[in-house]
């Protein structure tokens, strides 16, 4: 099912990825998208959202830094993208951390149809209404079944859910996959999850099967991080960051297939 050819489609087509994101990660997200062959646009003015929806191949909404004006822009952009039949991805950064974030995400989910939602276990648990001890924008700790959370949110919101962690879990409510690739250094650089959301968006833009696109994006991204770590003399985040960008720029179907670790995939019982 997963041949990782979506990666080549991204390189061939260069999808335009409209990002409404936060200032902490905007630069790395843009450079990461350029590295894989996509074309990023980082725009958040509500006055241009309707026009951008007609131009972009996918919209990625990231709630990392919120204010009222930005939330309004997100809603306008999401509705316009839905009208234009442009896929939309949500990264609910830190949704479990504050009541304001939870309120905003519930409003976004109510007004916009998302093709995919990507976050950590704590963020998706908050959306699912499951008990979880959030730690700011980090995953925190909890005992709930991550696969069950993914299935629940996917079914409730008719979307594909991508839960990042030591093992990534992807579900569309019917099908699921577990991915065990990835460098331990990824969580040590700010914005690695946000960039993954943007990368997932670029794959979704060129692949009709959103579940397949999401799995292949997660594997390809994680495998690139492993190749970057192999180049390190010392396993430090400052050295890893530019090597990871280089690994994204030089990734290939062959490299991904050689190291892909899909632990399990199939249909929910």
Swiss-Prot record:
| InterPro entries (alphabetical) | Hyethyz_kinase, Ribokinase-like
Q: Name one Pfam family in it.
A: HK
The chemistry this enzyme catalyses reads: 5-(2-hydroxyethyl)-4-methylthiazole + ATP = 4-methyl-5-(2-phosphooxyethyl)-thiazole + ADP + H(+)
So where does ATP get bound? 118, 164
Its lineage opens with: Bacteria, Bacillati, Bacillota, Bacilli, Bacillales
Any one GO BP annotation for this protein: thiamine biosynthetic process
What's the name of its gene?
thiM
The protein's job, in short, is: Catalyzes the phosphorylation of the hydroxyl group of 4-methyl-5-beta-hydroxyethylthiazole (THZ).
* Enzyme Commission designation: 2.7.1.50
MF annotations from Gene Ontology = ATP binding; hydroxyethylthiazole kinase activity; magnesium ion binding
Cofactor(s) needed, names only, are: Mg(2+)
Query: Pathway of this protein?
Result: Cofactor biosynthesis; thiamine diphosphate biosynthesis; 4-methyl-5-(2-phosphoethyl)-thiazole from 5-(2-hydroxyethyl)-4-methylthiazole: step 1/1
Q: What protein does this entry describe?
A: Hydroxyethylthiazole kinase
- Which top-level group of life is the source organism from? Bacteria
Q: What does the UniProt keyword field contain?
A: ATP-binding, Kinase, Magnesium, Metal-binding, Nucleotide-binding, Thiamine biosynthesis, Transferase
Chain residues that bind substrate: 42, 191
Q: Which family does it belong to?
A: Belongs to the Thz kinase family.
């Amino acid at each position: 099912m997963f041949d990782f050819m979506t990666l080549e489609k991204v390189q061939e087509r260069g999808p335009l990825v409209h990002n409404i994101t936060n200032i902490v990660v905007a630069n790395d997200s843009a450079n990461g998208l350029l590295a894989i062959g996509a074309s990023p646009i980082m725009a958040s003015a509500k006055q241009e959202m309707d026009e951008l929806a007609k131009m972009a191949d996918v919209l990625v909404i990231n709630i990392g830094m919120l204010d009222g004006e930005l939330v309004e822009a997100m809603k306008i952009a999401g509705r316009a993208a839905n009208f234009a039949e442009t896929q939309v991805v949500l990264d609910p950064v830190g949704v479990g951390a504050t009541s304001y974030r939870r309120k905003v995400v519930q409003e976004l989910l109510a007004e916009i149809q998302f093709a995919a939602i990507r976050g950590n276990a704590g963020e998706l648990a908050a959306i699912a209404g499951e008990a979880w001890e959030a730690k700011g924008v980090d995953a925190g700790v909890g005992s709930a079944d991550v696969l069950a959370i993914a299935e629940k949110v996917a079914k409730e919101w008719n979307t594909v859910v991508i839960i990042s962690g030591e093992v990534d879990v992807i579900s569309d409510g019917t099908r699921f996959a577990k991915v065990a690739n990835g460098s331990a250094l990824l969580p040590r650089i700010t914005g690695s999850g946000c960039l993954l959301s943007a990368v997932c968006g670029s794959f979704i833009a060129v692949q009709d099967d959103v579940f397949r696109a999401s799995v292949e994006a997660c594997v390809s991204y994680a495998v690139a991080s492993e190749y970057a770590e192999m180049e390190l003399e010392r396993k430090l985040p400052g050295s890893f960051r530019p090597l990871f960008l280089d690994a994204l720029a030089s990734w290939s179907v062959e490299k991904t297939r050689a190291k892909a670790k899909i632990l399990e995939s199939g249909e929910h019982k």
